[in-house]
Amino acid sequence: MKFELDKTQGRARRGRLQFERGTVETPAFMPVGTYGTVKGMTPEEVKETGAQILLGNTFHLWLRPGQEVMKLHGDLHDFMQWHGPILTDSGGFQVFSLGATRKITEEGVHFRNPVNGDKVFMDAEKSMEIQYDLGSDIVMIFDECTPYPATHDEAKKSMEMSLRWAQRSRNHFDKQENPNALFGIIQGGVYEDLRDVSVDGLTNIGFDGYAVGGLAVGEPKEDMHRILEHTCPQLPEDKPRYLMGVGKPEDLVEGVRRGIDMFDCVMPTRNARNGHLFVTGGVIKIRNAKHKTDTTPLDPHCDCYTCLNYSKAYLYHLDKCNEILGSRLNTIHNLRYYQRLMASIRSAIEEDRFDVFVEEFYARRDREVPPLKNA
């Protein structure tokens, strides 16, 4: 992987990631394909929304279908027929999400397989092996996602263990002679001093990119913004920065304002299935009865297949009838909205009008622009 940084405006960055499987223009949003599919979409449909890179889930793909089935096909690209780049998370967040059914030790994590109840163990080395078999273009280190809330001492112990796991991940990745990219994950909860230690430790180990983890786990937005404002300036300029599991359109804009290059989130796909559709002025709840007779498209500014062909009334009808097509059309629209948003952000940075873009973005939502410290 090669990262090129073309232009900056304030802390916002315009660049690109180059892989053997294709180029990713940044800032970029990655749709989530947890089980080797973006729910309800073919790879061709996902590509048509403008997506350049997908996220796959190491934990879930390890449990089902497993490494052997994956290797029979070649790797995850061959299995799901997505031939662009793929980033895989390490499984750390999913293990964190298991709650009381898991036991974390220095060696790794013992837990019950949520599929069949079997006892299972995952550690840094196993995560690297699974991601190697998946053929991930970007591999994530194995870490512990620090929960919120956490005391300073709890966050410190969690972050320090993640650093030790980061070194183990790096060692095993190098031992495999994996030709792809390996990203470190910064932890430390909402504590700036712990984030500093994490950044120092990870940059000393050395990675191809750096993710900010442990955010969007329940903390107030102000804390997320504060941690990003504090952390991003410390990261190497020549390496990509990835904000994990974020988020709403506003979160993407705020992340870019603070120096983030990459995002992923289930929000556009999950919200689509629940009838929450993102448009230029905010959100349309298609289940609202006022849309029953509305013959206009979701968003007159949108060029997606859904908006070019169907009315709000039709989407309302499909939702009321629980038709699968409704979820698919909604998903196409939401994914395209996110990609259009990222393309607009990239153009604005290129043309030195990102500040104006931000003002217009919030004006369309009748909201004030959130403050940006140390801009």
Swiss-Prot record:
Cofactor note: Binds 1 zinc ion per subunit.
InterPro entries on file: ArchSynthase1/Queuine_TRR (IPR050076), TGT (IPR004803), TGT-like_sf (IPR036511), tRNA_ribo_trans-like (IPR002616)
Entry GO MF terms: metal ion binding; tRNA-guanosine(34) queuine transglycosylase activity
Keyword set, alphabetical order: Glycosyltransferase, Metal-binding, Queuosine biosynthesis, Transferase, tRNA processing, Zinc
Residue numbers spanned by region RNA binding: 245-251, 269-273
Name of this chain's protein: Queuine tRNA-ribosyltransferase
UniProt lineage: Bacteria, Pseudomonadati, Pseudomonadota, Gammaproteobacteria, Vibrionales
Obligatory cofactor(s): Zn(2+)
Subunit structure: Homodimer. Within each dimer, one monomer is responsible for RNA recognition and catalysis, while the other monomer binds to the replacement base PreQ1.
SUPFAM superfamilies: tRNA-guanine transglycosylase (SSF51713)
Family: Belongs to the queuine tRNA-ribosyltransferase family.
NCBIfam families linked: Q_tRNA_tgt (TIGR00430), tgt_general (TIGR00449)
EC number of the protein: 2.4.2.29
Enzyme class name: transferase
GO CC aspect terms: cytosol
Residues that coordinate or bind Zn(2+): 302, 304, 307, 333
Gene Ontology terms describing biological process: queuosine biosynthetic process; tRNA wobble guanine modification; tRNA-guanine transglycosylation
